[in-house]
Design a protein with these regions (language model features):
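Conserved helicase motor core of SF1/SF2 NTP-dependent helicases
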Residues: 1-306
Length: 306
């Protein structure tokens, strides 16, 4: 069983999956890959063109790019098989079609029950990226009333003036620090720097600026919270997440996204990771006029506003 399988490149798995015993037979009878191809893949230094595959024998088995995981390749192959079966229904008997479709679908499945996010926190990602299929387990923090708790909020910032680094935003750093204080005061003795609060932002310069703003508050516990990029946050969770977009110019919107497409639906894997780290509350700050140029971000802001 391989967990986080979408973070592992194919060559890193071949050694174990292709292992032979002393008798020369396959040592691995069956393997199960668990992962989420709608979140960030493994980090690869080469660009898509450099890692592309051109060998016909490899292309024939769905191996199109070395930056893709075995999980992604097998999933694509399975879904493509299902589509071929459905499109060729006129050429096969109902029994043949039913059996083939069943066999193809049985090759993969989706774990739909999630125990991390409160349903209101999960709402956008669930609708936009998972077709509304995510179901809360019903843990205490997922069923508690929202009457006195703000689950999802957006705090508008202003872009930095020309001449300032594009990778910092002072107004967002101040908003983040102010929110951090309020969250700390709300939790008091229950505040746990490794569990209560995390801050996500795309640039190292903005990370440093946010840390500086927080240090000026003179609250030791806040100095120990994790402030990092979305890539470093994948796989972790906090009760409350603050996301500073730090977009000062339109061209930065492209850097913020990691796009893929499935069944005609555009999926931003980077945004998906950022929005699914919070258990109880998710706070976002950014320049709304710029963010609304991206259709997904615009939909997110519209949901929050409603």
């Amino acid at each position: 069983i391989v967990d986080e399988a979408t973070q592992i490149l194919e060559p890193q798995l071949l050694g174990i999956l292709c292992a032979r015993g002393e008798d020369g037979k396959d040592a691995i009878d069956k393997f199960v890959l668990i992962g989420d191809h709608k979140q960030l893949p493994a980090v690869v230094q080469q660009n898509t063109e450099q890692s592309a595959i051109y060998d016909e024998s490899l292309l024939s088995i769905g191996l199109t790019n070395l930056k893709d995981s075995l999980f992604e390749r097998l999933y694509r192959n399975c879904t493509a098989t299902v589509q071929r079966i459905l499109s060729s229904s006129e050429q096969s008997s109902p029994l043949e079609q039913s059996y083939s479709s069943f066999a193809a679908h049985r090759s993969y499945d989706m774990l739909c029950r999630q125990g991390r996010m409160h349903p209101e926190v999960a709402l956008f990602a669930n609708r936009a990226f998972y077709g509304g299929r995510l179901i809360p387990v019903g843990l205490p923090h997922q069923i508690e009333s929202s009457d006195t708790i703000c689950r999802l909020a957006f705090y508008p910032s202003v872009p930095e003036k020309a001449g300032t680094s594009a990778k910092i935003n002072y107004s967002e750093a101040r908003i983040v620090a102010d929110l951090a204080v309020r969250i700390y005061e709300d939790h008091q003795a229950d505040f746990d720097e490794s569990r209560t609060l995390g801050i996500i932002t795309p640039y190292r310069s903005q990370i440093a600026l946010i840390k500086k703003e927080i240090e000026s508050l003179g609250i030791p516990a806040l100095n120990r919270i994790l402030v990092d990029t979305v890539e470093r946050f994948q796989g972790s969770e906090r009760d409350v997440i603050i996301y500073s977009f730090c977009v000062n110019y339109p061209y930065q919107l492209k850097f913020l996204s990691n796009l893929t497409e499935e069944e005609g639906v555009l999926i931003d894997r980077k945004l998906n990771v950022a929005l699914t780290r919070a258990r109880k509350q998710m706070f976002i700050t950014g320049v709304s006029e710029l963010l609304e140029r991206n259709p997904l971000y615009k939909s997110l802001l519209k949901l929050i506003e409603s």
